[in-house]
């Protein structure tokens, strides 16, 4: 299995080598679920197309270089890293078994994600200090609408899409 975790501001490259590992515990937490899971925690240079393309290239490289089950490749994006993750989900949603978007906004196009039916779990605080909760709520509603337009049942949608808004 492979878990790719994309950092927020504190984990960007200019913050210093390894700062993403000191400021965010997503990769360490993922190992609690699967001790054999390979963790990739790149330090991005931005939250845009360049980092999205680099994330995809890194994932493809790791899949080719290591014995990783392609059905167990997961992506996580926190804060600005979630913006990058949403662009990755626009470009190559089928590369990942699921995506965890935390305290972020959705910058990518949701159509390719809906077509691929890659499961997404969105988590945000109701009063998130940077983004607020509205951006993820809006993305959730838009993606839910796309699934409804595709004829999916509520049970099928619930298997693919979760919005967890914390008080």
Where are these regions (language model features)?
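Short, proline-enriched alpha-helix->beta-strand connector loops that line the catalytic pocket
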Residues: 35, 114-120
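Short, solvent-exposed loop/turn and secondary-structure capping segments
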Residues: 13-19, 51-53, 87-88, 110-113, ...
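Gly/Ser-rich "nucleophile elbow"/oxyanion-hole loop immediately N-terminal to the catalytic nucleophile
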Residues: 47-79
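Active-site machinery of serine-nucleophile hydrolases
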Residues: 2-56
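C-terminal catalytic histidine-bearing segment of alpha/beta-hydrolase fold enzymes
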Residues: 123, 127-137, 141, 146-167
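Primarily recognizes the serine-hydrolase "nucleophile elbow" in alpha/beta-hydrolase
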Residues: 71-114
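Solvent-exposed loop/turn segments at secondary-structure junctions
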Residues: 8-12, 44-49, 79-83, 104-108, ...
């Amino acid at each position: 299995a492979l878990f790719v975790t994309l950092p927020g501001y504190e984990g960007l490259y200019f913050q210093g080598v390894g700062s993403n590992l000191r400021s965010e515990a997503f990769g360490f937490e993922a190992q609690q679920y699967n001790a054999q899971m390979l963790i990739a925690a790149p330090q991005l240079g931005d939250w845009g197309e360049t980092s999205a393309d680099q994330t995809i290239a890194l994932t493809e490289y790791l899949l080719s270089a290591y014995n990783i089950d392609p059905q167990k490749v997961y992506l996580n994006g926190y804060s600005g890293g979630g913006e990058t993750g949403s662009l990755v989900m626009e470009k190559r949603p089928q590369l990942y078994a699921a995506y965890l978007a935390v305290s972020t906004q959705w910058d990518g196009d949701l159509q390719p994600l809906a077509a691929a039916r890659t499961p997404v779990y969105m988590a945000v605080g109701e009063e998130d200090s940077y983004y607020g909760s509205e951006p993820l709520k809006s993305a959730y509603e838009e993606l839910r609408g796309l699934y409804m337009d595709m004829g999916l049942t509520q049970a099928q949608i619930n298997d693919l899409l979760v919005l967890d808004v914390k008080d």
